[in-house]
Amino acid sequence: MQIQDDAGRARYDALMEVIRRRMTVRAFDPSHEVPREHYEMILEAARHSPSGANAQPWHFIVVTETGLKRKIMEYFREEQLRRAKLKMKFPTPDYRGLASAPGLIVVASDFRWVRAFPVLNDGSELDRMYKQNAERILLQSVAAATMAAHLAAAALGYNVWWVTAIGQEAAQKAMKPLLGIPDELSVLDIMCFGPPAKAPYKRWKKSLAEITNWNRFDPAHAMTEAQIDEWVATQRQKAMYKDASNVD
């Protein structure tokens, strides 16, 4: 099938408009009610995502009960305080927005699906390496579905929040009983969405030239350990939370 240049460009421009308007907020207008149809449209987009071996190793738990949202928020508030006591120096977000998010979807996966990917299952060192890669395949697959859901929410006019601080064992122990998730599954992230409590702003992005390499990696793009440590110490918080001049 030959793609017409004008039609292809129009589709690209429409897609880029959605991608650019997908902005993170952490405080929502709690008065908005997400219609069931919007949940289904968002998850329909996720359903069509690519996955390793077409295993589709994802499950989505739609949380609409106010009490459940509050309990999820309470766990993350405890995590916020825990990080403060540990003096991690990480600019932890304000998790109270979890309770006010009109839309909330918990993303889970079953790591037994790594068996669908190239593995030996003989306990060898080579098998360990293959299984390590298989876990990456699974995580990449679920991330692709989650991103599709985020873009669908943005297309519907919502702002979003990708909550990732959920991999540690304490989070699993808190979330699984609360949501009736079987032990065999793992909670990977939470998607919040809705109209923002206040106008969002676009985060700083690296320029196209900084991230693009043709045929070989450009050594000028490599960073030393010291440069990365310097960025974390001086630029991370600005990149996460502040407006910047280099926003496109």
What are these regions (language model features)?
Residues L81-K85, Y95-G97, K176-R203:
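A glycine-rich helix N-cap at a beta->alpha junction
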Residues I42-R47, I105, F111, N121-L178:
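Small-aliphatic-rich amphipathic alpha-helix that forms the alpha element of a beta-alpha
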Residues Q56-A143:
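Glycine/small-residue-rich phosphate/adenosyl-binding loop
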Residues A14-S31:
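Generic N-terminal amphipathic, Lys/Arg-enriched alpha-helix
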Residues Q2-A7, R11, S186-D248:
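C-terminal helix-cap and adjacent tail motif
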Residues R47-N54:
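Glycine-rich phosphate/pyrophosphate-binding beta-alpha loops
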Residues I19, I42-A46, M191:
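Short alpha-helical scaffolding segments that buttress acidic/His motifs in well-ordered protein cores
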